[in-house]
């Protein structure tokens, strides 16, 4: 197997296959569940809006794919600074049956100099999650400033995040190697049990390999696993399957 094929295989096993569109329906989520069961093995998770969790759970059970985790989003996509609403949404997501919650950090508040609300929001949402995994989306493409990307990562980890995630996929700049370098360095300094999720903008096996390479350089090859590394993506899967010669070439897409 070539290095590119190895990267494609790993990326599928590390993928949160995502649909977070305004026109999502039960049928689109059912289709997503079927796609997550690939000829190259199952993706790590699917990521969907909370209201679709019950139909996703039913579908994955019917497919015998109980190992695929169900992730959802809260305080999404704008990262508002209302802690009470973020906590209510997170509690509701857990009640729906989410295995993982991706919450948006109040990044605009941080840009305005308020560090406290981000820390408190993540801390409160982690408490609401209990044993459910909490990923914190810092929206690195909007923060832009390396110092702000670093600070959002530090605050999230200090507040109890299980993962830090680059992006919502709803802004012009999503996952970048520069942001990955900063975020993974913070993980190496603070707590190597915390995971990292680049989301949006990873289009093919070559790009996936670049992100994996940064993680391995900073934290070691043994660190990378579904417990510590995920790709958030919608259009990436078809490209990876094509690399593995298990699907036709993907059509151009604007997908996440």
From Swiss-Prot:
<dbReference type="GO" id="GO:0005737">
    <property type="term" value="C:cytoplasm"/>
</dbReference>
<dbReference type="GO" id="GO:0016052">
    <property type="term" value="P:carbohydrate catabolic process"/>
</dbReference>
<keyword id="KW-0704">Schiff base</keyword>
<protein>
    <recommendedName>
        <fullName>Deoxyribose-phosphate aldolase</fullName>
        <ecNumber>4.1.2.4</ecNumber>
    </recommendedName>
</protein>
<feature type="active site" description="Proton donor/acceptor">
    <location>
        <position position="197"/>
    </location>
</feature>
<keyword id="KW-0963">Cytoplasm</keyword>
<keyword id="KW-0456">Lyase</keyword>
<comment type="pathway">
    <text>Carbohydrate degradation; 2-deoxy-D-ribose 1-phosphate degradation; D-glyceraldehyde 3-phosphate and acetaldehyde from 2-deoxy-alpha-D-ribose 1-phosphate: step 2/2.</text>
</comment>
<dbReference type="GO" id="GO:0006018">
    <property type="term" value="P:2-deoxyribose 1-phosphate catabolic process"/>
</dbReference>
<feature type="active site" description="Proton donor/acceptor">
    <location>
        <position position="102"/>
    </location>
</feature>
<comment type="function">
    <text>Catalyzes a reversible aldol reaction between acetaldehyde and D-glyceraldehyde 3-phosphate to generate 2-deoxy-D-ribose 5-phosphate.</text>
</comment>
<dbReference type="InterPro" id="IPR013785">
    <property type="entry name" value="Aldolase_TIM"/>
</dbReference>
<feature type="active site" description="Schiff-base intermediate with acetaldehyde">
    <location>
        <position position="165"/>
    </location>
</feature>
<comment type="similarity">
    <text>Belongs to the DeoC/FbaB aldolase family. DeoC type 2 subfamily.</text>
</comment>
<dbReference type="InterPro" id="IPR023649">
    <property type="entry name" value="DeoC_typeII"/>
</dbReference>
<dbReference type="GO" id="GO:0004139">
    <property type="term" value="F:deoxyribose-phosphate aldolase activity"/>
</dbReference>
<dbReference type="Pfam" id="PF01791">
    <property type="entry name" value="DeoC"/>
</dbReference>
<dbReference type="GO" id="GO:0009264">
    <property type="term" value="P:deoxyribonucleotide catabolic process"/>
</dbReference>
<dbReference type="InterPro" id="IPR002915">
    <property type="entry name" value="DeoC/FbaB/LacD_aldolase"/>
</dbReference>
<dbReference type="InterPro" id="IPR011343">
    <property type="entry name" value="DeoC"/>
</dbReference>
């Amino acid at each position: 197997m070539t290095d590119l094929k190895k990267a494609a295989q790993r990326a599928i096993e590390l993928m949160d296959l995502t649909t977070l569109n305004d026109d999502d329906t039960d049928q689109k989520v059912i289709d997503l569940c079927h796609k997550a069961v690939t000829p190259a093995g199952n993706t790590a998770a699917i990521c969907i809006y909370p209201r679709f969790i019950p139909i996703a759970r039913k579908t994955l059970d019917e497919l015998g794919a109980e190992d695929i985790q169900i992730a959802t989003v809260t305080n999404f996509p704008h990262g508002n600074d209302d802690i009470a609403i973020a906590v209510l949404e997170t509690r509701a997501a857990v009640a729906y049956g989410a295995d993982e919650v991706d919450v948006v950090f109040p990044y605009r508040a941080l840009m305005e100099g308020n560090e406290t609300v981000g820390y408190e929001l993540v801390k409160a949402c982690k408490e609401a999650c209990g044993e459910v995994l909490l990923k914190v989306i810092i929206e690195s493409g909007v923060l832009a400033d390396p110092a702000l990307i670093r600070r959002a990562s530090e605050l999230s980890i200090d507040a109890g995040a299980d993962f830090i995630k680059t992006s919502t996929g709803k802004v012009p700049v999503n996952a970048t190697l520069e942001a990955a370098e900063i975020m993974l360095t913070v993980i190496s300094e603070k707590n190597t049990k915390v995971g990292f999720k680049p989301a949006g903008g990873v289009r093919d096996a070559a790009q996936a390999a670049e992100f994996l390479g940064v993680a391995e350089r900073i934290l070691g090859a043994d660190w990378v696993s579904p417990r510590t590394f995920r790709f958030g993506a919608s259009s990436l899967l078809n490209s990876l399957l094509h690399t593995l010669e298990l699907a036709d070439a993907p059509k151009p897409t604007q997908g996440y």
